[in-house]
Curated annotation (Swiss-Prot):
Alphabetical list of HAMAP family matching this protein: FtsH (MF_01458)
Name of the protein described by the UniProt record: ATP-dependent zinc metalloprotease FtsH
Subunit structure: Homohexamer.
Organism lineage string: Bacteria, Bacillati, Mycoplasmatota, Mollicutes, Acholeplasmatales
Listed GO biological process terms: protein catabolic process; proteolysis
């Protein structure tokens, strides 16, 4: 398809019309200045010329034939003797008939006989000589307007072609290495769903004979980075068919009708390449519900969507064209786009679980030099919620860190640091705590660790650190005991208790509090409110008080439906406060019962600054951190020596 599109002219390439104008100006200026700078020529009549010869004013005479077959004309030119040239004049010229030239020659012969010391030099050119410069300049003056007219017509034609190119589709035909299913990990169910599409593209006759209709459109739904585009490429790579990819925003332009024209052109090209796959990324840019949003609809977008609907439902089911699209906002799509016969199948790309993350790590590690001792299962456990794109970025960051330190392989330490950089930002090593501030941050993070160790169903603390990153002075990395689709009320209460552990530790140990619990409160309040208004986990009963409004404003749901009274709103606030208070008191009770553990974890945090799960478990079991204590002993012994 790209071959049909004319190559675009470089922005640095000058316009042909400008070049022609510059050339014409240069020629005109050349002749103008040549004329201005050239010495003046005296034009004689015959009697003046004879008088000048007889008075000794003429030094040279050059006769050149300039007439044709019917006119015996001669051009006589020459120079004056010294001191006899008129002011500003360098030469003379006179045109004579042949018989009059003979008379002039006789006069010159007589003059030379009388003045042998200062004779007139005579030269004779019997044939016409060609003046190439005059011919070239004449031809240029004749040809320039013709060339100018031709270029103007070509420019007009080019503008017309540009207008046509403006309405052509911008889909790109995928070339180069084909993506295969082996390049995709952690999406076994999604790949199985796509298997029949691949079989249809390879063996369409088998389905046609059975009277089966393969889905015309497949909509891939999922969070950003879950592999929607990669899966679509893999389907095309496995089926060995052309793959046309385009973004939804490429259809929409300022001018009404352009998007619809591009849709028509896209399907025209696809029919010529069938069987093939058309992939529309971010289809919500063009497929958003018609008439929705502030200010009503958008004529250009709606016309484009209408044309897309017609094309999807208009071509024959046996053409072998499958439409695939991706979006992370299926709620904003027009219902007509999702009905059977168009996008009649939806495949949800889930955020990978621990097993899937491990498989994805193995795929992205193929091109990386990793330490053989690294266990992918441990890495996968430490990065809950990471998508495939996040994992690729994680390993790339780890590779950059290893290369920066001139190491030959990527270590587990590099991966840990990369995970921290991806989630929280780079460490702010230049920022220094005051001793009191460092102690408060250490006890805050130690409070989270104690709750994770002592509260049943609380998430496991994989790491705590007091190294500042981003806006956080320190943070604790949690991983759930088990990744689930559904969570019990007791598990949600444990999550809230874990979030409040840091503030409780500050209050108990310092009888003061800091702003460090800002994000903890945000997470705890959101969970508690969801328990009351969405999950029915309060005394208000199994009623959903808040839900998505379903109204799309500028592509995003800004509002929540309020289907309850102000009195109920007050009850909701009381229930949320009751949940937070209950969890806060529970955290206080646990911290008070485990003050020694809190002190030990905080003590080592102040010294080491970062503790792993292994370190925390050792401190909880023995009250010590052996590797650090041994290191302290060695340093003390060196100082004493």
């Amino acid at each position: 398809m790209n071959k049909q599109q004319k190559p675009k002219r470089s922005p640095l390439r000058p316009d042909y019309l400008v070049i022609v104008i510059i050339i014409l100006l240069a020629i005109g200026m050349y002749f103008f200045f040549t004329e201005m700078m050239a010495p003046k020529v005296k034009q004689f009549d015959e009697f003046e010329f004879i008088a000048a010869i007889e008075s000794g004013q003429i030094a040279t005479v050059r006769s050149e034939y300039v007439g044709g077959d019917n006119f015996n004309l001669w051009e006589v030119t020459g120079t004056f003797t010294t001191g006899n040239a008129p002011e500003g004049v360098g030469s003379y010229v006179i045109i004579l008939y042949g018989d009059r030239l003979n008379n002039i020659q006789d006069i010159i012969i007589t003059y030379n006989e009388l003045n042998p010391s200062t004779p007139i030099t005579v030269s004779f050119v019997p044939h016409v000589s060609v003046d190439f410069w005059n011919i070239i300049s004449t031809l240029l003056l004749i040809a320039a307007p013709i060339v100018l007219v031709v270029i103007m017509f070509r420019s007009m034609s080019s503008q017309s072609n540009k207008a046509q190119d403006f309405t052509k589709n911008r889909a790109k035909l995928s070339q180069g290495r084909k993506v295969k299913f082996s390049d995709i990990a952690g999406a076994d169910e999604e790949k199985a769903e796509m298997a029949e599409l691949i079989d249809f593209l390879k063996n369409p006759k088998k389905y046609a004979d059975m009277g089966a209709r393969v889905p015309k459109g497949v909509l891939l739904v999922g969070q950003p980075g879950t592999g929607k585009t990669l899966l679509a490429k893999a389907v095309a790579g496995e089926a060995q068919v052309p793959f046309f990819s385009i973004s939804g925003s490429d259809f929409v332009e300022l001018y009404v009708g352009v998007g619809a024209s591009r849709v028509r052109d896209l399907f025209k090209v696809a029919k010529q390449s069938a069987p093939c796959i058309i992939f529309i990324d971010e289809i919500d840019a063009v497929g958003r519900q018609r008439g929705a949003g502030m200010g009503g609809g958008n004529d250009e977008r709606e016309q484009t969507l209408n044309q897309l609907l017609v094309e999807m439902d208009g071509f024959s089911a046996n053409l072998g064209i499958i439409i695939m699209a991706a979006t992370n906002r299926p709620d904003v799509l027009d219902p007509a786009l999702l009905r059977p016969g168009r996008f009649d199948r939806q495949i949800t790309m889930q955020v990978p679980d621990q097993k899937s993350r491990e498989e994805i790590l193995k795929v992205h590690a193929r091109s990386k030099k990793l330490d053989p001792t690294i266990k992918f299962s441990e890495v996968a456990m430490r990065i809950p919620g990471f998508t495939g794109a996040d994992i690729e970025n994680l390993l790339n960051e780890a590779a950059l860190l290893a290369a920066r330190e001139s190491r030959t392989v990527i270590s587990m330490q590099d991966i840990d640091e990369a995970a921290d950089r991806v989630t929280m930002g780079p460490a702010k090593k230049s920022r220094k705590y005051s001793p009191n501030e460092k102690k408060m941050v250490a006890y805050h993070e130690a409070g989270h660790a104690v709750i994770g160790l002592k509260v049943n169903l609380a998430s496991t603390v994989q790491k705590v650190t007091i190294v500042p990153r981003g806006r956080a002075g320190g943070y604790a990395l949690y991983t759930p005991v088990e990744e689930k689709f559904n969570y019990a009320k007791s598990e949600l209460l444990a999550m809230i208790t874990s979030a409040l552990g840091g503030r409780v530790a500050e209050e108990i140990m310092f009888d003061d509090v800091t702003t460090g619990a800002y994000d903890d409160f945000k997470r705890a309040t959101k969970l508690a409110r969801s328990m009351v208004t969405e999950y029915g986990m309060s005394d208000l009963g199994p009623i959903q008080y808040e839900s998505d409004s379903g109204n799309v404003f500028l592509g995003r749901d800004y509002l929540k439906d309020k289907n309850f009274s102000d009195a109920v709103a007050l009850e909701i606030d009381r229930e949320v406060r009751a949940i937070i208070t209950e969890c806060y008191e529970h955290a206080r009770k646990v911290i008070n019962e485990n003050k020694n553990l809190l002190d030990n974890i905080a003590k080592y945090l102040i010294a080491v600054e970062t503790l792993t799960k292994t370190d925390i478990d050792e401190i909880a079991a023995t009250g010590q951190l052996q590797w650090w204590d041994n290191r302290e002993v060695e340093e003390d012994s060196k100082k004493s020596e």
